[in-house]
């Protein structure tokens, strides 16, 4: 049995990981907007791969330690 309950919103049931996903997506966009002006993407070999890895790391950190 999972320790996290299923969330019901307007008659639709969502798994708990869905809300962690939404929070991590929001945090990803904030971090991405902060990294854009720094010019870090000039040093990144593959920006899409970097963004995917950044999102995966944020999702893991929020799921494991945050929410």
UniProtKB/Swiss-Prot annotation:
Which regions span the lipid bilayer?
Answer: 10-30, 43-63
One of the record's GO cellular component terms: plasma membrane
Q: Domain of life of the organism in this record? A: Bacteria
Q: Where in the cell is it found?
A: Cell membrane
- Write out the entry's keywords from A to Z: Cell membrane, Membrane, Transmembrane, Transmembrane helix
Q: How does it sit in the membrane?
A: Multi-pass membrane protein
User: Is Membrane set as a keyword in this record?
Assistant: yes
Give start-end of the signal peptide.
none
Q: Pfam families attached here?
A: DUF1656
NCBIfam families cross-referenced by the UniProt entry: PRK11594.1
Q: Which family does it belong to?
A: Belongs to the AaeX family.
Protein name, please? Answer: Protein AaeX
Organism per entry:
Pectobacterium carotovorum subsp. carotovorum (strain PC1)
